[in-house]
Amino acid sequence: MNPIVKQFKYGQHTVTLETGAIARQATAAVMASMDDTTVFVTVVAKKDVKEGQDFFPLTVNYQERTYAAGKIPGGFFKREGRPSEGETLIARLIDRPIRPLFPEGFFNEIQVVATVVSVNPQISPDLVAMIGASAALTLSGVPFNGPIGAARVGFIDNQFVLNPTMAEQKQSRLDLVVAGTDKAVLMVESEADILTEEQMLAAVVFGHQQQQVVIEAVKEFAKEAGKPRWDWVAPQPNTDLINKVKAIAEARLGDAYRITEKQARYEQIDAIKADVIAQITAEDEEISESKIVDIFTALESQIVRGRIIAGEPRIDGRTVDTVRALDICTGVLPRTHGSAIFTRGETQALAVATLGTERDAQIIDELTGERQDHFLFHYNFPPYSVGETGMIGSPKRREIGHGRLAKRGVAAVMPSLAEFPYVVRVVSEITESNGSSSMASVCGASLALMDAGVPIKAAVAGIAMGLVKEEEKFVVLSDILGDEDHLGDMDFKVAGTREGVTALQMDIKIEGITPEIMQIALNQAKSARMHILGVMEQAIPAPRADISDYAPRIYTMKIDPKKIKDVIGKGGATIRSLTEETGTSIDIDDDGTVKIAAVDSNAAKNVMGRIEEIVAEVEAGAIYKGKVTRLADFGAFVAIVGNKEGLVHISQIAEERVEKVSDYLQVGQEVNVKVVEIDRQGRIRLTMKDLAPKQETEINQEDPVEEQE
């Protein structure tokens, strides 16, 4: 084995690419490392196409092995299971920039597998996996129009930082990943702390410029270690079949794409498609339906794109920069903590916000360490939202990705835990969909959070932009429909406040998207966002002053950290009885901060009073009401403030001589006692003699009564 190694500097890190020693039966395999974070990436490509295959079957799998961080998996089976949400998101991050670089008509099955085998807690594996995938595909010889580069851009002290460490990312106002070829940006995924459009674009350009180092290094690596390029030729178009489909369908499709209502339009298009298939297969039974459908779909694209480039109205009759009609309702679900329905044209999201306590936080065990997530965002896309039937079950990759994008859009305006001590969960149920459902989720989430009384810093809105480009002509579209997303050249989603951008996601299917085009798209998106925010502010101008009556209220008090063990009790008995008897939940921090969550304020006050009793200091000379807990021959034990026990000696029970303790006291009896002494070991000596004359008067345990003469 003679491994081939390529090493280069990338920002502050050293990247190493190695091939030829491991997984030699795969089409290509690369061990990619960046400062001890190592990802092993393999590519397997089938030489033959499956019979009847009419799409490109690319699969990207990203998997993290716990041994990479020197850990053993938890759970009963002690091995890795199904992909986590983080693994799914990184698999999508790898997939999105490489998929557009395979030629049209290439239907050979390809599987990319990225396995994290070593991890430096300061270096995130996602970037390493993207670089490794780019290198492996370039070495494999498949018709891949790469390589791609990938860069992470941070923004610290008003300076862009290339590939910041995990520690630096905590100080950064931006987390942006950009991928592209030597000529063009293909993918952007980002989260920002309200930056301007100009700053976001500058970050994209900066990242694309810096990643040229990776692209050049991969090209040099491929010259030395690459396999011969596949002798693949794109299938020749069947001009006779194309002309037949055009003759039957072109005029009718033109009319169908003037129907503004989605379901009616789809019914008409399906009828035309069925007619085209029936007519052509009747003439020649050997022609496959899939080839007819491919030509039919291409014709649809030509019609829609041609009209947009020519300046004609869009599918639903709008101009290029018009946002669909908006409809907003808040407080729609009576027993939830906050809710809203956001409707934009034929896209609708029901967003619901729920407030919880710290124990509801999600504990995420990542390779780079364990962390707690206090803001949860879940996106559901049921089949009925597009008028279809289908499986209902665990979230798919798309739902996880859309949920994360929407969360990124809202995260920047969420209050800190110190400002608002609640765990917040938002669920977006997509009830109708015709494009831009993730951005509808951002708008709906912002409204639901304000309805729940969450003091977000500002309202957030999101908008999806599209692009149609033919040679030098291009048109940027605001608030794209599902069809415009499918038939266009760019999907460009922007979320933000009136002050700036909180999230940007970009997927570009073609080369030639210049910074100038991106700037136009960003400016047009800003205009649309301001319009949407204006309508949202009319519905609910600010967060509600108070949280829902059905939400838990969190009360905070401080105790001496030395007293924490007293509140918890032996084996947790004390705190357990407090929560069970009052229906509250209690969390105690190491610094003595006690957080009590209760729907009923009286229950919370009751618990706070009882905790104050438990932690209260017993004062010598003070009189307390106590309860007899047990009897002995030499006296009685009495629980006073905070269930602290003291001894009333038999000689201190009454003025007269006491022969038998049980003649005077019984277990459970309430008596007034005075603290005579607290010795060095903390033992309390009590007396029932020399008390105030009115025995039955209850003594406030928080304000001990002074000894009376």
Swiss-Prot record:
<feature type="domain" description="KH">
    <location>
        <begin position="552"/>
        <end position="611"/>
    </location>
</feature>
<dbReference type="InterPro" id="IPR015848">
    <property type="entry name" value="PNPase_PH_RNA-bd_bac/org-type"/>
</dbReference>
<keyword id="KW-0808">Transferase</keyword>
<dbReference type="InterPro" id="IPR003029">
    <property type="entry name" value="S1_domain"/>
</dbReference>
<dbReference type="GO" id="GO:0004654">
    <property type="term" value="F:polyribonucleotide nucleotidyltransferase activity"/>
</dbReference>
<feature type="domain" description="S1 motif">
    <location>
        <begin position="621"/>
        <end position="689"/>
    </location>
</feature>
<dbReference type="InterPro" id="IPR012162">
    <property type="entry name" value="PNPase"/>
</dbReference>
<feature type="binding site">
    <location>
        <position position="491"/>
    </location>
    <ligand>
        <name>Mg(2+)</name>
    </ligand>
</feature>
<dbReference type="Pfam" id="PF03726">
    <property type="entry name" value="PNPase"/>
</dbReference>
<dbReference type="Pfam" id="PF03725">
    <property type="entry name" value="RNase_PH_C"/>
</dbReference>
<dbReference type="GO" id="GO:0000175">
    <property type="term" value="F:3'-5'-RNA exonuclease activity"/>
</dbReference>
<dbReference type="GO" id="GO:0000287">
    <property type="term" value="F:magnesium ion binding"/>
</dbReference>
<dbReference type="InterPro" id="IPR020568">
    <property type="entry name" value="Ribosomal_Su5_D2-typ_SF"/>
</dbReference>
<comment type="subunit">
    <text>Component of the RNA degradosome, which is a multiprotein complex involved in RNA processing and mRNA degradation.</text>
</comment>
<dbReference type="InterPro" id="IPR004087">
    <property type="entry name" value="KH_dom"/>
</dbReference>
<dbReference type="GO" id="GO:0006402">
    <property type="term" value="P:mRNA catabolic process"/>
</dbReference>
<dbReference type="InterPro" id="IPR001247">
    <property type="entry name" value="ExoRNase_PH_dom1"/>
</dbReference>
<dbReference type="Pfam" id="PF00575">
    <property type="entry name" value="S1"/>
</dbReference>
<dbReference type="GO" id="GO:0006396">
    <property type="term" value="P:RNA processing"/>
</dbReference>
<protein>
    <recommendedName>
        <fullName>Polyribonucleotide nucleotidyltransferase</fullName>
        <ecNumber>2.7.7.8</ecNumber>
    </recommendedName>
</protein>
<keyword id="KW-0460">Magnesium</keyword>
<keyword id="KW-0694">RNA-binding</keyword>
<comment type="function">
    <text>Involved in mRNA degradation. Catalyzes the phosphorolysis of single-stranded polyribonucleotides processively in the 3'- to 5'-direction.</text>
</comment>
<dbReference type="InterPro" id="IPR027408">
    <property type="entry name" value="PNPase/RNase_PH_dom_sf"/>
</dbReference>
<keyword id="KW-0479">Metal-binding</keyword>
<dbReference type="InterPro" id="IPR015847">
    <property type="entry name" value="ExoRNase_PH_dom2"/>
</dbReference>
<dbReference type="InterPro" id="IPR004088">
    <property type="entry name" value="KH_dom_type_1"/>
</dbReference>
<comment type="similarity">
    <text>Belongs to the polyribonucleotide nucleotidyltransferase family.</text>
</comment>
<dbReference type="GO" id="GO:0005829">
    <property type="term" value="C:cytosol"/>
</dbReference>
<dbReference type="InterPro" id="IPR036612">
    <property type="entry name" value="KH_dom_type_1_sf"/>
</dbReference>
<keyword id="KW-0548">Nucleotidyltransferase</keyword>
<dbReference type="Pfam" id="PF00013">
    <property type="entry name" value="KH_1"/>
</dbReference>
<dbReference type="InterPro" id="IPR036345">
    <property type="entry name" value="ExoRNase_PH_dom2_sf"/>
</dbReference>
<dbReference type="Pfam" id="PF01138">
    <property type="entry name" value="RNase_PH"/>
</dbReference>
<dbReference type="GO" id="GO:0003723">
    <property type="term" value="F:RNA binding"/>
</dbReference>
<feature type="binding site">
    <location>
        <position position="485"/>
    </location>
    <ligand>
        <name>Mg(2+)</name>
    </ligand>
</feature>
<keyword id="KW-0963">Cytoplasm</keyword>
<dbReference type="InterPro" id="IPR012340">
    <property type="entry name" value="NA-bd_OB-fold"/>
</dbReference>
